[in-house]
Amino acid sequence: MAIIQLGSTCVAQWSIRPQFAVRAYYPSRIESTRHQNSSSQVNCLGASKSSMFSHGSLPFLSMTGMSRNMHPPRRGSRFTVRADADYYSVLGVSKNATKAEIKSAYRKLARNYHPDVNKDPGAEEKFKEISNAYEVLSDDEKKSLYDRYGEAGLKGAAGFGNGDFSNPFDLFDSLFEGFGGGMGRGSRSRAVDGQDEYYTLILNFKEAVFGMEKEIEISRLESCGTCEGSGAKPGTKPTKCTTCGGQGQVVSAARTPLGVFQQVMTCSSCNGTGEISTPCGTCSGDGRVRKTKRISLKVPAGVDSGSRLRVRGEGNAGKRGGSPGDLFVVIEVIPDPILKRDDTNILYTCKISYIDAILGTTLKVPTVDGTVDLKVPAGTQPSTTLVMAKKGVPVLNKSNMRGDQLVRVQVEIPKRLSKEEKKLIEELADMSKNKTANSTSR
């Protein structure tokens, strides 16, 4: 090991695999430096054995990103320097806290920050930090090393090489067996979200136009009450699948002229769960049973055939802690025999006599709001469309806005006339010819 002084900074370098420790340089604190075969040993005050620094000195800074398998840093390389983690602050306990207090603090924080409960982006990283702190402070040997030398002291601890920590979800499972429906690394990897459920709701024309609140009965898969969703027979515990080693997947290899091809498949022995268990007699190992449930559904005004309403979380239950699916209600509207719908407009066709078309009239027109009087002006031509404003369908999710009702006028021409009617029409025709002739002569 060589000591290189850079201004007020000391850099300790070990052979060809460098590690860095940065701190303020105090020459008076170094007792002696002995050179042996191009490597050096530095003794510092305050340490029980030869080491770089004691935990009681200034904060120890270590270079991150360096591992035993990495090459020495190149010139100009950029490094991230971080301070030692304060495990006591992480758990919110004092340095004199008892094991019971440390455990209680960990349990409380782990529940709050477990990724299956807390969906914040930084929750999982915080959960790992809490687990690492508890792993150190709950172990007498590791806690003693940490109190004396900080994180650097843990790197040399037996079973704790390079500062590695246990999987935080395994640690959680050891203290919270069965908590929250089985959270942890295994259940997280095996969790299966529930599928969506679909329901067809039939409405009449007016119900679709104005909306309504209706109680419906749906059928869906719910968590089995006998096994609490685990799929295992009560009183039994699942064992690791020997086929896939608990991974839930197996790899098959096939040699071809082009090389060896590998394929990852779901383990058929455990169906991807990684565990083998005695199946529950109620749900046959699925963890779910089909049940019916009545829910109140609010249908907004303006829906039409093909509209889909989404009710979150009311679909089929998930497996092994998976999220439930959603309920999709598909609308089907029974057509009205008289009124037709065109988006937000309503179409209606009426017939009037040629006399009414000539002289004008008032009609009784059916609408979704009831029967309304419609004035047909004199001289209305065949196929004229009259507009009844705001008598149409409300705009979906904007019930204060409505379409119109469009009334198409058909003028009926009689095929047969009585003698009197024919005579009057002929007189009318003569009058029309005379009127036309007079206007032309002028």
UniProtKB/Swiss-Prot annotation:
Gene Ontology CC entries for this record: chloroplast; chloroplast envelope; chloroplast thylakoid membrane; vacuole
Induction (UniProt): Induced by heat stress.
CDD domains hit by this protein: DnaJ, DnaJ_C, DnaJ_zf
Binding, Zn(2+) 1: C224, C227, C280, C283
Transit peptide: 1-82
Molecular function GO labels: ATP binding; heat shock protein binding; iron ion binding; unfolded protein binding; zinc ion binding
CXXCXGXG motif repeat locations: 224-231, 241-248, 267-274, 280-287
Disulfide cysteine pairs (residue numbers): none
Family of this protein: Belongs to the DnaJ family.
HAMAP family documented for this protein: DnaJ
Stated name of the protein: Chaperone protein dnaJ A6, chloroplastic
Biological classification of the source: Eukaryota, Viridiplantae, Streptophyta, Embryophyta, Tracheophyta
